[in-house]
Amino acid sequence: MQGNFSKKIDPMSNLPFTVAALYCFAPLPQYESLREPLAQLCCANGIKGTLLLAAEGINGTVAGSAGAIEKLIAHITAIPGLGEPELKYSHASEMPFHRMKVRLKREIVTMGVEGIDPLKSVGTYIAPKDWNALIADENTVVVDKRNDYEYAIGTFEGAIDPQTRTFREFPEWVKQNRDRLEGKKIAMFCTGGIRCEKATAFVKGLGFDDVYHLKGGILKYLEEVPREQSMWNGECFVFDERVAVGHGLAESDVELCRACRRPLTPQDKLSQFFEEGVSCAGCYAERQKQVKLAEKRGANKHIGS
């Protein structure tokens, strides 16, 4: 189940840039031929961001004027065999991307497991309005399908952090934590929904039946569920210069450490290890880890010297 093209760009937004996050799983055997027309359209209309093309479909986040984004979405939905993408709009005060990239990939979201096809088997979609009831159920185990640095600045109440650094690590985490999932309703969520398409397909392939995922991801939940009813705590990391968004998809005060690219909350910036443009507590912790590893190997402890 995919498709959310009926959702229109908010004409009342007073912010100059429209951000469109989209994906669609569909067989695209000639996907290489789609690259140049997409790149030309985006460049001609001042659109920036990233689009990924693979034999399994399309995925990406782009930004531009409302009119430019409408042209791009119309072009994408007209691609033979593709259909309507899962689509989410938000807005930004400044262009959140530096350039436009249209890339050819083996997967539109890289899990690294052969044979995973969300078009054949996928978890049950749960609308944002129904999500709270599912995750409040005592027989539900809630799994944050994102990476550790995303979890660190915001997640749903009671969600498990698999402590993965990339999506490729998730299959191994599932195999090592089967006992935590057995006999439970498994509710997964991610930023926009695409990682859960493959994650739920993978988990169902292991024999789990009660597998669910948040339709439209955190972004759709933050857009549709009122703050006073929300079970979301913190901010949602996004992969652009906005860094994170909150309820109503409003831009947050989270920033990036320019050294290690970790998200930093205002509280993180109070750390003694934070130096603007140089380092943060995360940088320090990673460096200390490398120093200890070097000492165990008998190497020079002055890493990088």
Swiss-Prot record:
Transmembrane segments: none annotated. Keywords: Oxidoreductase, tRNA processing. One of its GO terms (molecular function) is oxidoreductase activity, acting on paired donors, with incorporation or reduction of molecular oxygen. Belongs to the TrhO family. Catalyzes oxygen-dependent 5-hydroxyuridine (ho5U) modification at position 34 in tRNAs. PANTHER family: RHODANESE-LIKE DOMAIN-CONTAINING PROTEIN 7-RELATED (PTHR43268:SF3), THIOSULFATE SULFURTRANSFERASE/RHODANESE-LIKE DOMAIN-CONTAINING PROTEIN 2 (PTHR43268). HAMAP family: TrhO. This is tRNA uridine(34) hydroxylase. It comes from Brucella melitensis biotype 1 (strain ATCC 23456 / CCUG 17765 / NCTC 10094 / 16M).
